[in-house]
Amino acid sequence: INGRILTPQGWLKDGSVLICDGKILEVTNSDLAVIGATVIDARGMTIVPGFVSMHAHGGGGHDFTEATEEAFRIAATAHLKHGATGIFPTLSSTSFERIYQAVDVCEKLMKEPESPILGLHIEGPYLNPKMAGSQYDGFLKTPDENEYIPLLERTSCIRRWDISPELPGAHDFAKYTRSKGIMTAVTHTEAEYDEIKAAFAVGFSHAAHFYNAMPGFHKRREYKYEGTVESVYLTDGMTVEVIADGIHLPATILKLVYKLKGVENTCLVTDALAYAAYEGNEPIDPRYIIEDGVCKMADHSALAGSLATMDVLVRTMVKKANIPMEDAVRMASETPARLIGVSDRKGALAKGKDADIVILDKELNVRCVWSMGKIVPGTDNLLHK
């Protein structure tokens, strides 16, 4: 594949990515043809690593919390076509019976050799009900080791779990998940500095959808207090993710997060619902409405989730927040791959990594996607120029 290439060391202006048997064989600054190889000419375009989506609830008209093989396949494929070659399906707050069903589906699909599904992400049900947002109130509870320990003893497919750190039992939960190598994030929280500092010490390493479902600087009577947002900024080593659709957060805040937390500590996430990459017009869930390019609660009490795919996030960061393209791409690929533990094979265009490749045109639209060395159906635009 010939074109302008983003490597871990920087840009190759006119180079080639050689792929074989699903892996990257070599990334070179030469665009000379290789004998016996099929050549994809992407000159004038940009070749970047496949994106790693570690917080998306659904897409293509299906929600991962449906916990069916059909829902997982359709939603994952919807995001794959937009460049997400590594996907961690996200469950909203639900019953443990449904979580076990989702685990069974996830484990099955992860065994398929070319599956983009890399593990499961759970958001809830251990959430502060005051900060529930669009989460299902009826499932919210405090952490119960009689629920989560048997689950995590049974499966290793759960790679991330987000809860409210101020709940009773939250610290024991985080200590246990950390012992299992599971990324644990604060979310839907009112925690202030001392609580965030204590949470970080026991294993909460990440802040989910930073700024959303958490307070910033605020007053109680005549006194002022730091919020969760400032507390996370002050906690060195705590990483963050932002819903960079340009709606959940304005461009100025996206730029602020980039400046203060940096590329190494910031991930781009969609937090997408079933409506992402969905061709229908009617809401799937009566609790929601689609308005102004985003999913809202029908009572206008809160944003419910985005309609974005990973390519939208990169375009937003570059075009609206004026972030350098290489940094925007890294926050959508290299950084999430490292934080969630798949950087040995995902997140970068380098020898030996999986051949997960996205080709973008000058407007940063996806022109072609390779997943494990194979062109994703429906994205073979370069073959029909």
Give the role of each language-model region.
Residues 1-34:
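N-terminal metal-binding scaffold of metallo-dependent hydrolase/deaminase domains
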Residues 77-88, 128-155, 198-239, 279-303:
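Active-site gating loops and adjacent loop-to-helix segments of metal-dependent hydrolytic enzymes
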Residues 57, 61, 73-102, 115-128, ...:
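Divalent metal-dependent hydrolysis catalytic cores, especially in the metallo-beta-lactamase
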Residues 44, 79, 122, 177, ...:
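Conserved, mostly hydrophobic/aromatic
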Residues 224-242, 258-270, 275-360:
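His/Asp/Glu-enriched, well-ordered alpha-helical/loop segment
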Residues 3, 280, 338, 348-385:
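C-terminal cap of metal-dependent C-N hydrolases
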Residues 153-278:
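Active-site core of metal-dependent hydrolases
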